């Protein structure tokens, strides 16, 4: 029957109501979870060559919904030059977790690549890892939610040797919130 779910209750079509439902997020990449206004503010603050107008900015940084699927074009939107300071990285991690909490997510497994955040400025990968974990944990505590982490290795930007070194570095941090690793990037050209 149209408008009803299997149990016979009326379907909920109100987005605000859906946001209140408790949710679990098991596969969220920090690098792709930024709220557009936060990203725009950071781009303008850091003098990136991107449109100041929000509508044009959105076109420049988001994958168009009506486009043909193109994995490499999609990956090209994940720029490494957004982050000029450690504060930028802290702010993004903190704001992203609060945004997820506002969507009703109470448990998150957040993936992030220390390499992605470190590449532009050659930040120390262990410092990045500790910073992201701290920022996300502080936001999670504020929002009353849980967050765990997976460290992402990027097959396009890291050699196997670099991945193993990063793994050993992260393991040496002894942060129990880091529960796994992930392999991401262009699977076709970098199997």
Please state what every model-predicted region is:
Residues 2-191:
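Metal-cofactor-binding active-site regions of metalloenzymes
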């Amino acid at each position: 029957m149209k408008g009803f779910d299997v149990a016979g209750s009326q379907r909920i079509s109100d987005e605000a109501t859906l946001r209140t439902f408790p949710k679990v997020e098991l596969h969220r990449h920090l690098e792709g979870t930024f709220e557009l206004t936060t990203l725009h503010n950071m781009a303008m603050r850091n003098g990136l060559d991107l449109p100041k107008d929000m509508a044009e900015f959105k076109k420049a940084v988001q994958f168009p919904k009506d486009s043909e699927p193109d994995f490499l074009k999609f990956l090209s939107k994940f720029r490494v030059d957004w982050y000029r300071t450690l504060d930028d990285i802290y702010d993004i991690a903190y704001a992203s977790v609060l945004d997820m909490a506002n969507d009703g997510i109470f448990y998150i497994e957040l993936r992030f690549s220390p390499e992605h955040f470190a590449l532009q400025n050659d930040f120390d990968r262990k410092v990045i890892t500790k910073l992201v974990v701290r920022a996300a944990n502080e936001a999670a505590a504020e929002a009353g939610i849980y967050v765990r982490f997976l460290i992402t290795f990027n097959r396009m930007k890291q050699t196997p040797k670099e991945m193993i070194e990063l793994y050993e570095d992260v393991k040496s941090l002894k942060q129990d919130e880091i529960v796994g690793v992930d392999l991401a990037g262009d699977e076709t050209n970098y199997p």
